[in-house]
A protein has these predicted regions:
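Proline-centered helix-kink/hinge sites
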Residues: 27-29, 36-37, 61, 79-82, ...
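Conserved pre-motif I regulatory segment
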Residues: 1-47
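Walker A/P-loop NTP-binding motif
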Residues: 33-44, 55-70, 86, 90-96, ...
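Conserved P-loop NTPase nucleotide-binding/switch module
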Residues: 153
Length: 154
């Protein structure tokens, strides 16, 4: 049995276009197993070694389901470090390259909270951040979680 290709995984057209442009040819095993489950709206606990494509395994299906016109966060990604928050946010941005009106915001301590507040006010669909800064925004009531459709603990 051959492994699926990205076209057969039911990703949205803009996400699929970005995947192709990034040079992805075949989904990794973790991607091939995870993407259909997440597109179906099911919960998933996925574990795999570093470098196996875990970020794409959760980012691609969630991006395929995002409403680009909605300005409040729909996807929340919690990461343990600022470095990982930045890396994951950059990955989301590259996979969403052809999604008009898409915005992702990395939020973490040590960065200017004023800029984060302005970005949240303008509207973002994906928030990627560390628990401490997320709690800070929740206490300030600057982070609206009422429209969250997906939560990722990375």
């Amino acid at each position: 049995m051959s492994s699926p290709d990205f076209e057969s995984l039911s990703l949205s057209a803009p996400v699929l276009k970005a995947v192709k442009q990034l040079g992805y040819e075949q989904p990794s095993p973790v991607q091939a197993q995870s993407i259909p489950i997440l597109l179906d709206g099911k919960n998933l606990l996925g574990t795999a070694q570093t470098g196996t494509g875990k970020t794409a395994a959760f980012a691609l299906p969630f991006l395929s389901k995002i409403d680009e016109k909605q300005r409040s966060p729909q996807i929340l990604v919690l990461t343990p470090t600022r470095e990982l928050a930045i890396q994951v946010a950059e990955a989301f941005q590259s996979y969403a390259k052809y999604m008009k009106g898409f915005n992702v915001l990395p939020i973490y301590g040590g960065a200017d909270i004023g800029g984060q507040l302005r970005s949240l006010k303008r509207g973002v669909q994906v928030v990627v951040g560390t628990p401490g800064r997320m709690l800070d925004h929740l206490r300030r009531r600057s982070l609206d979680l009422s429209q969250i459709e997906g939560l990722i603990l990375d």
